[in-house]
Amino acid sequence: MHQMTLAEIARGLAEKKFSSEELTRVLLSRIATLDPQLNSFISLTEDLAITQAQAADARRAAGENGPLLGAPLAHKDLFCTQGIRTSCGSRMLDNFKAPYDATVVSKLASAGTVTLGKTNMDEFAMGSANESSHYGAVKNPWNLQCVPGGSSGGSAAAVAARLLPAATGTDTGGSIRQPAALTNLTGLKPTYGRVSRWGMIAYASSLDQAGPMARTAEDCALLLQGMAGFDPQDSTSIDEPVPDYSASLNTSLKGLRIGVPKEYFSAGLDPRIAQLVHESVKELEKLGAVVKEVSLPNLQHAIPAYYVIAPAEASSNLSRFDGVRFGYRCEDPKDLTDLYKRSRAEGFGPEVQRRIMVGAYALSAGYYDAYYLQAQKIRRLIKNDFMSAFAEVDVILGPTTPNPAWKIGAKTNDPIAEYLEDFYTITANLAGLPGLSMPAGFVDGLPVGVQLLAPYFQEGRLLNVAHQYQQVTDWHTRAPEGF
């Protein structure tokens, strides 16, 4: 039962082969048995899950039918869940129970999904390895000595280990796509504004976007259908009709123009990953796609621009955690200043403190123009590069990550090396574009992903290309040993 995809579960429930409650109990027992090896969950919500599963079964018995009705999933622990701990992977929010549900959570709940728990993540979503969590590192099910990627590493590890069929994630600079690549999943970052950010604890507000993580493009289409849509409570939500993503999965790729940027194949890319990228291009050509080289001339400026903009926004967003209204509060503060200083020093981990300091520096008087303003100008240039490329092609293809998963602890003392792992993913966030990572092979037994980017609101195109690719390859069907 645990091997089934979301689409297979939907069919099984519709045909009454099993009930949502039966499936939920099977998965909860798998999580109890296997998750101690992975540490992919921060909180389990067994009672809620059983209640929701029974309610979904009752709705189905009453004649209701829907692809997500009774489907089990988990939420990354930065989506507010009413009455359930929402920690953001931080000591700062270890005792925080949200008073309301995030829009993503409430939309999926009304579609009938069953919440099994909240997944582990890098603290405040700051990281590419899921090592900065207050609750300990998450292990990659493909090799328990390796990282699963981050910051949505808990969601990635849980889905890859077949603890559940799908999960929600968020992507600020690659936090859905990079862990999806490192754990053999399909992960989609939608267009900025496609999915509501209301109730999603912010890291960098102009970059954050929620999306689905699953084993197949078909499953991502089902989950995105339940997540996407306009939300008046989110001022950056875009009032654009939501297409039927599943309906667009079977479009022929004949004549589809795929652009491969020449700047992607630089010295930092593992040559074995480059080889797998070229092989995936050949598969798509066999399906009728036309491939041409494109250029993204400002790509080399993306990392420095991102690591000014994201920390700058984070330093502002995280100023609300001051030990006064909610979250961690230090013991016996001498005065208000001491309360602020010690609560933040004790509540935030070292990586979060590092990024707050970088961000506050970039926004400080005298440096704002030199750093933050320059970074925003580079951001505009990067967006323009994509617009020029998309005038010639329909989809851009390249590696998701420069390397496969690395050993836990290998980059802890070299944050720049970890930041460089986001080289291929952050441009989509800076430009607000949709991006998808799909499984494309293995290097030394570790999964590798290929990334697809498309123009604004063309998530359906990305899902279709990935789905067609997954009809002729079997990478996405492979499971880690022991799970």
Swiss-Prot record:
The keyword Ligase applies. PROSITE patterns: AMIDASES (PS00571). It catalyses: L-glutamyl-tRNA(Gln) + L-glutamine + ATP + H2O = L-glutaminyl-tRNA(Gln) + L-glutamate + ADP + phosphate + H(+). One of its GO terms (molecular function) is glutaminyl-tRNA synthase (glutamine-hydrolyzing) activity. GO terms for cellular component: glutamyl-tRNA(Gln) amidotransferase complex. GO terms for biological process: translation. The keyword Protein biosynthesis applies. InterPro entries: Amidase (IPR000120), Amidase_CS (IPR020556), Amidase_dom (IPR023631), AS_sf (IPR036928), GatA (IPR004412). Keywords: ATP-binding, Ligase, Nucleotide-binding, Protein biosynthesis. The active site is at K76 (charge relay system), S151 (charge relay system), S175 (acyl-ester intermediate). Its EC number is 6.3.5.7. SUPFAM superfamilies: Amidase signature (AS) enzymes. Heterotrimer of A, B and C subunits. Allows the formation of correctly charged Gln-tRNA(Gln) through the transamidation of misacylated Glu-tRNA(Gln) in organisms which lack glutaminyl-tRNA synthetase. The reaction takes place in the presence of glutamine and ATP through an activated gamma-phospho-Glu-tRNA(Gln). PANTHER family: GLUTAMYL-TRNA(GLN) AMIDOTRANSFERASE SUBUNIT A, TRANSAMIDASE. NCBIfam families: gatA (TIGR00132). Belongs to the amidase family. GatA subfamily. This is Glutamyl-tRNA(Gln) amidotransferase subunit A.
